[in-house]
Curated annotation (Swiss-Prot):
UniProt entry keywords in alphabetical sequence: ATP-binding, Chaperone, Metal-binding, Nucleotide-binding, Zinc
Chain ranges of the ClpX-type ZB domain: 1-50
Family: Belongs to the ClpX chaperone family.
Keyword Transmembrane helix appears in the UniProt entry: no
GO process terms (BP): cell division; proteolysis involved in protein catabolic process
Oligomeric and partner information: Component of the ClpX-ClpP complex. Forms a hexameric ring that, in the presence of ATP, binds to fourteen ClpP subunits assembled into a disk-like structure with a central cavity, resembling the structure of eukaryotic proteasomes.
TM spans (from-to): none
Protein name: ATP-dependent Clp protease ATP-binding subunit ClpX
Primary role: ATP-dependent specificity component of the Clp protease. It directs the protease to specific substrates. Can perform chaperone functions in the absence of ClpP.
Residue positions binding Zn(2+): 8, 11, 31, 34
Binding site for ATP: 130-137
GO molecular function: ATP binding; ATP hydrolysis activity; ATP-dependent protein folding chaperone; protein dimerization activity; unfolded protein binding; zinc ion binding
Top-level lineage group: Bacteria
Length: 423
């Protein structure tokens, strides 16, 4: 009686028909050909993003119909006018950003067209301003106006490669994911890094200990911000051996970084010899020092270095602009003037329920005053209105008899119920 011949459990071929047959638990076998087939399937899945990337790079194909090879560039005046529709105040910052963005994308469109040997450098932007002054909103609105990919990164979560936290290169992954892995589109996008001041090194002197979330992050950001070809994992996270990586060129990515830079005012005061304490003439100087915003307008690169930003990184952020503290009237305007103002948003929500929503002028003033007390800028406005509207939005969908709701000063100040007009 002949011996039973072993077969591959997947394709059914006998051991004579294959080069090698591997045995698993029990009588399960797999041949070398099936192993290779499984490996090919896994490899194709892992490399699919990379292949699409290569096709996009070579101009062969693109599955992303939203990608537009031609950038429709607005003039600086037009960019600022668009910003005015969404952002209240901060005119100086809007002008600086409009010019910087125009020059940046003009540089991209003109790249390689001139033969005079003049190479236009990238002008990344640093926004200095208090919490809630509109730094993030300005960056978001710019990306929306220009129809380019946009990603936000929080600098406080970034650490040097190899340590717990997000690798700096993960900010590039967010941008790639924001445009559905369309690499050429990502390579002309905008990245906003918030809380940039939080990665300042602990002192001006070079430390003998490793500062993985401060100077270490700054060093890692240097090349990315200046322009380099980075290898990043498609899904982010840490790099692993044998992992397929996607290459992205950052030379045409505009980086906008922002921070409150608490303590910068004192550094500027010290440089301009206007002392916080003193007698006689010095007291007179202190009385005429102006507001915090006016001092920020005098910021120089050397002040940022004293704050803990390394000189090399300061040099890669040539455009520096400051944002003003928001006063009461500006906060009131923020509530009602922009296209997507928070009051307009709630009015639309109520309109969808068939109800008219109104805020009295006294109520708007009280909201602005409360936001000023909280020292949260425009962010405080949303928090106050969200709290005020909570009960109303909870009950409104269940009540079909309401015609109009009016939010008064007492609704804000004394937590009284809003005035309701029934049908």
């Amino acid at each position: 009686m002949s011996k039973k011949m072993d077969r591959c459990s997947f394709c059914g071929r006998t051991e004579r028909e294959v080069t090698q047959l591997f045995q698993g638990p029990g009588d399960v076998f797999i041949c070398d050909s099936c192993v290779e087939s499984c490996h090919s399937l896994l490899r194709d899945d892992m490399y699919s993003l990379a292949r699409e990337y290569e096709n996009l790079r070579d101009g062969k194909s693109s599955n992303n119909k939203n990608y537009k090879g031609k950038i429709e560039l607005l003039k600086p005046v037009e960019i600022k006018a668009k910003l005015d529709e969404y952002v209240v105040g901060q005119d100086e910052a809007k002008k600086v950003l409009s010019v910087a963005v125009y020059n940046h994308y003009k540089r991209i469109l003109n790249n390689g067209q001139d033969d005079d040997g003049v190479e236009l450098q990238k002008s990344n932007v640093l926004l200095v301003g208090p919490t809630g002054s509109g730094k993030t909103l300005l960056a978001q609105t710019l990306a929306k106006i220009l129809n380019v990919p946009f990603a936000i990164a929080d600098a406080t979560t970034l650490t040097e490669a190899g340590y717990v936290g997000d690798d700096v290169e993960n900010v590039l992954v967010r941008l790639i994911q924001a445009c559905n892995y369309d690499i050429p589109n990502a390579e002309r996008g905008i990245i906003y890094i918030d809380e940039f001041d939080k990665i300042a090194r602990k002192s001006e002197n070079v430390s003998i200990t490793r500062d993985v979330s401060g100077e270490g992050v700054q060093q890692a950001l240097l090349k990315i911000i200046e322009g380099t070809k980075s290898q990043v994992p498609p899904e982010g996270g840490r790099k692993h051996p044998n992992q397929e990586l996607i290459e992205i060129d950052t030379k045409n990515i505009l980086f906008i970084v922002g921070g409150a830079f608490e303590g910068l005012e004192k550094i500027i005061k010290a440089r301009t010899n206007k002392k916080v304490i003193g007698f006689g003439a010095e007291v007179q100087k202190q009385d005429n020092m102006g507001t915090e915003g006016e001092f920020f307008k005098k910021v120089l690169p050397e002040d940022l270095m004293k704050q803990g930003i390394i000189p090399e990184l300061v040099g890669r952020l040539p455009v520096i602009t400051t944002l003003d503290n928001l006063d009461e009237q500006t906060l009131i305007n923020i509530l009602t003037k922009p296209k997507n103002a928070i009051v307009k948003q709630y009015q639309k929500l109520c309109k969808l329920e068939g109800v008219k929503l109104e805020f009295t002028q006294e109520a708007l003033t009280e909201i602005a005053k409360r936001a000023l007390k909280r020292k949260m800028g425009a962010r405080g406005l949303r928090a106050i209105i969200e709290h005020t509207m909570l009960d109303i939005m909870f009950e409104l969908p269940s009540n079909n008899n309401i015609k109009e709701i009016t939010i008064t000063k007492d609704t804000i100040d004394n937590y009284k119920k809003a005035e309701i007009e029934y049908k």
